[in-house]
């Protein structure tokens, strides 16, 4: 429980990670480099609020639930705005093939947030010594579900590609 509370961190550093994650997602989608999407998943600070929200919900701590949701919304907003601004600044005019591919959703898309949630729950209930997967790896799985769609929302808005925006918002919605 204490680890989850400590993962909340200060606002400036938290938002800096969200912006940096948004920049790396944007570069990855813009240059069609999947490896950069993985890097963005490592940088994006979505795991802390997710794990804290899970603990707060289990404890019935409404104040901590509110703080966790605020952090979630702030991180997503920072990532979306960053991707939007970069698309505008660099005068991006068309969606890349990777953007289109990443925005496509199917019923199989529901498996990622389900797997991420189960992995996160297992990580929270196991002691550090008995856990086979580190908290960082579990955090990456949570971020994997959120970082690319958040970037796609911003880029899609900048391009006026509402199909990409709607599909990415749908992905964010089912994953949160």
Predicted stretch roles:
Residues 70-176:
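Generic detector of multi-pass transmembrane helix bundles and their immediately adjacent loops
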Residues 1-2, 14, 28-29, 95-97, ...:
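Short amphipathic alpha-helical segments, especially helix-boundary/capping motifs
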Residues 2-4, 103-104:
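Short charge-dense sequence patches
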Residues 7-87:
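Core alpha-helical transmembrane segments of integral membrane proteins
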Residues 3-13, 136-141:
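Short, amphipathic, aromatic/basic-enriched membrane-interface segments that mark the entry/exit
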Residues 2, 52-63, 121-131:
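C-terminal ends of transmembrane helices
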């Amino acid at each position: 429980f204490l680890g989850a509370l400590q993962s909340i961190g200060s606002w400036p550093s938290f938002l800096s990670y969200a912006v940096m994650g948004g920049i790396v997602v944007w570069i990855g989608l813009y240059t069609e480099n999947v490896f950069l999407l993985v890097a963005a998943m490592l940088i994006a600070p979505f795991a802390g609020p997710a794990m804290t929200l899970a603990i707060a919900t289990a404890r019935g701590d409404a104040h901590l639930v509110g703080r966790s949701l605020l952090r979630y919304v702030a991180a997503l907003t920072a990532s979306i705005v960053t991707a939007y601004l970069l698309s505008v600044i660099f005068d991006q005019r068309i969606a890349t093939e990777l953007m289109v591919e990443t925005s496509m959703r199917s019923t199989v898309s529901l498996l990622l947030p389900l797997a991420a949630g189960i992995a996160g729950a297992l990580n929270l209930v196991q002691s550090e010594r008995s856990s086979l997967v580190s908290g960082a790896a579990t955090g990456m799985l949570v971020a994997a579900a959120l970082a690319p769609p958040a970037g796609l929302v911003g880029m899609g808005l900048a391009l006026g590609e509402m199909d990409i925006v709607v599909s990415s918002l749908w992905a964010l919605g089912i994953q949160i």
